[in-house]
């Protein structure tokens, strides 16, 4: 390339200077935490990490872990929550959405906004395969998604917040929610009306592939909208040796399975995430009999509510069309009453920025990371639709569970474990997010 002449060099200098002026007003990606915020985070983390406090947290988590309860069956867990709130001196409403508890801490320093902090309480229908002293004592039930830790962290936050009650300007609501696992407990909590006055809401979820002391999230769309479906194809049963005298629903189901895969590969923008997974197939139970009916079921997900609605429409159309082509009838059920579809979890930019700043002040900027979008569904989305919300992952891994020789056991695994040193971190972060929000939005 030939060297530029003098005129060209002058133009380059002018352009560079203009760029400096143009972008000088833009904020940098990180800002130093105020001394007051940093001190708040340090104080709360030190209090939660003190031997007596941390031991109390571990004891709570182990008691909950040993007695897991499924969706809307969290009777014993709810009793434990209420007993601890009574001991701390925090009033509450119960029952909420059957087994839930909503506690309220009214600040003694004046009026202000209402901040909600949320933890889910239910376990999963899994047999725990981790051999340890505090293993689940309930056959076929396990806290394999860390909800025992979530409840513990929020109880820890309750204790921290109650100790500072007289300094708070505003109200903090602590939501101990039932039935996150597929049953949309958040929706039912909102139906109670107890959160109608909430200004903002914050939630945490454990994640085993991040170490203790690290949190992660992202602004905007974070977790997918998710729904389930089931379909039954009805034909005409008969002898497998004379299929022409029957109407085979197994062929119709098979055709539908293949056609449904094209929803992602041929109808979805490759730059937009979507999933259609068939996870259940049922037909006959004899080798020489064409069954009268066959069925399929599965899940579908999208990073947008609009995308989920499109998938729902097309799933019905494809199933009914494939049934018709194969001379069968089809009934499609999206299980909207039993397993209500979850909206996409979308973090409010302002609330995400607030929680991120608090976490950076407490844990250090290097320990607050940008998370990848997740195709997991989360009913925190219902809250975030109603009030500006922020949902963060909190690390529960360590050198043993994340080391080179270790296979990270994901949530929903019967081998899932967590490092209890994360419990004080979660308790302190919950409390700090709420306190700092009230401090920044003082109504006086």
Curated annotation (Swiss-Prot):
Claim: Cytoplasm is one of the keywords in the record: no
Biological process (GO) annotations held by this record are: auxin metabolic process
Q: Which Pfam families match?
A: M20_dimer, Peptidase_M20
Q: Which UniProt keywords apply?
A: Hydrolase, Signal
InterPro entries (UniProt xref):
Amidohydrolase, Bact_exopeptidase_dim_dom, ILR1-like_Hyd, Peptidase_M20, Peptidase_M20_dimer
Q: Which residues form the signal peptide?
A: 1-32
- Write out the coiled-coil annotation as residue ranges: none
Q: Does the keyword Signal apply?
A: yes
Q: What is its EC number?
A: 3.5.1.-
- Which top EC class is named for this enzyme in its record? hydrolase
Q: Which GO terms describe its molecular function?
A: IAA-Ala conjugate hydrolase activity
Q: Which family does it belong to?
A: Belongs to the peptidase M20 family.
Task of the protein: Hydrolyzes certain amino acid conjugates of the plant growth regulator indole-3-acetic acid (IAA).
Q: What name appears for this protein in its UniProt entry?
A: IAA-amino acid hydrolase ILR1-like 8
Instruction: Please give the organism.
Output: Oryza sativa subsp. japonica (Rice)
| Higher taxonomy | Eukaryota, Viridiplantae, Streptophyta, Embryophyta, Tracheophyta
> What gene is this protein translated from?
ILL8
């Amino acid at each position: 390339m030939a060297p530029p002449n003098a005129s060209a060099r002058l133009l380059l200098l002018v352009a560079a200077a203009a760029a400096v002026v143009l972008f000088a007003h833009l904020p940098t990606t990180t800002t130093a935490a105020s001394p007051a915020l940093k001190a708040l985070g340090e104080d709360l983390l030190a209090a939660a990490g003190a031997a007596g406090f941390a031991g109390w947290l571990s004891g709570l988590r182990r008691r909950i872990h040993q007695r897991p309860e499924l969706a809307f069956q969290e009777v014993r867990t709810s009793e434990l929550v209420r007993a601890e709130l009574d001991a701390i001196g925090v009033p509450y409403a119960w029952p909420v959405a059957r087994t839930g508890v909503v506690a309220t801490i009214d600040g003694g320093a004046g009026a202000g906004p209402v901040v909600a902090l949320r933890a889910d309480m239910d376990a999963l229908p899994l047999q725990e395969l981790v051999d340890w002293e505090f293993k689940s004592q309930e056959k076929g039930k396990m806290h394999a998604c860390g909800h025992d830790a979530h409840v513990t962290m929020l109880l820890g936050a309750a204790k921290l917040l109650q100790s500072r009650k007289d300094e708070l300007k505003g109200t903090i609501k602590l939501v101990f929610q039932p039935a996150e696992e597929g049953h949309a407990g958040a929706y039912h909590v909102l139906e109670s009306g107890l959160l109608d006055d909430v200004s903002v809401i914050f939630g945490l979820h454990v994640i085993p592939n991040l170490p203790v002391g690290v949190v992660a999230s992202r602004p905007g769309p974070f977790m997918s909208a998710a729904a389930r479906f089931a379909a039954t194809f009805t034909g005409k049963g008969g002898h497998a040796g004379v299929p022409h005298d029957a109407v085979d629903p197994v062929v119709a189901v098979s055709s539908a399975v293949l056609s449904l895969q094209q929803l992602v590969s041929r109808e979805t923008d490759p730059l937009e995430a979507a999933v259609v997974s068939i996870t259940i197939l049922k037909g006959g139970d004899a080798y020489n009999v064409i069954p009268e009916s066959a069925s399929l079921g599965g899940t579908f997900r999208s990073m947008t509510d609009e995308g989920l609605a499109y998938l729902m429409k097309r799933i019905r159309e494809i199933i009914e069309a494939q049934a018709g082509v194969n001379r069968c009838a089809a009934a499609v059920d999206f299980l909207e009453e039993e397993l209500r579809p979850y909206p996409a979890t979308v973090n409010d930019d302002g609330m995400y920025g607030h929680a991120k700043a608090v976490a950076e002040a407490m844990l250090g900027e290097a320990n607050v990371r940008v998370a990848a979008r997740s195709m997991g569904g989360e009913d925190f989305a219902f809250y975030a639709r109603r009030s500006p919300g922020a949902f963060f992952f909190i690390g529960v891994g360590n050198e043993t569970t994340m080391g080179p020789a270790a296979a990270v056991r994901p949530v929903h695994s019967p081998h899932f474990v967590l490092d209890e040193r994360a419990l004080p971190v979660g308790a302190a972060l919950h409390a700090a997010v709420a306190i700092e929000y009230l401090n920044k939005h003082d109504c006086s």
